[in-house]
Amino acid sequence: KELFQTVVIQNKLPLKSDSEKLKKKNPYNFDFSNVTEEDIIRGMIESDISVFLHGMSGDGKSARVIQLDPDCEIIYLRNATPDSLNGKSVYNPTSGEMIDVQPTWYKKVCKKCEDEPDKIHIVFFDEITNALPSVQGMAFNIVLDGEVNGKWKLPENARIVAAGNDLNDSLSANTLSEPLFNRFAHVYINTTVDSWLKWAITPKQNYERLDYVKEEEHLIIHPAIYTYILYMRYCRHDALRTPYNGEKPNADPRKWEMASKVLYSTGRPEMLRALI
């Protein structure tokens, strides 16, 4: 009951009880309204829990991972082969023996983790729902055992994050097997106009990184783009995302970021109308 009353207060709904007294009953200052998707993802990663990000194409799943670890090792499972993901064995004619060759991505992750042992490094399995079933099975073993090909352990400071498009958003998407699905904590990305507008004016160097190192300064979304999306919102029209009809390109958060880059590169904000 006390928890319910506290939640009602923090959402500014009227209660007959004295607000100040109820706030004193919340000594830990819980504020449920300020927990973002990024907070949840970050908490899972720091807790060494493998995370699966769901969402529509262009919703910024990859961008959220890169916010936390700009140097994350991205593995596009759509294009992965068993050899590229799991390594391979080659014959050595000199010794007459088979030699195990580690996959390139694994070598890179090991080097990053060794060079920066106090930093968490993310192994990002992108487009996992578009991967071949055989590749998904290998990814499952990596997530389950924390090792590649049953031979090479992931470093202690490596974490796994995966992402995939919804089945109704990609014709080539495959349903994950139940064991693989259940190995992840699942976060469903929902990019709203309000959350995007907040992100759009946040300088990228202000992101709360996992490593807290100084990053190259990146530009915020171009003011012309921001103003247009905001104006359309007040006109009760969602211009951030439009449905794809199979003929013309649709709008989504990723395409607005592309348009922003064009306006910055050309220095011609009047191009906004043509881009729209």
Give short role names for the model-derived ranges:
Residues 3-276:
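C-terminal regulatory/interaction module of P-loop NTP-utilizing enzymes
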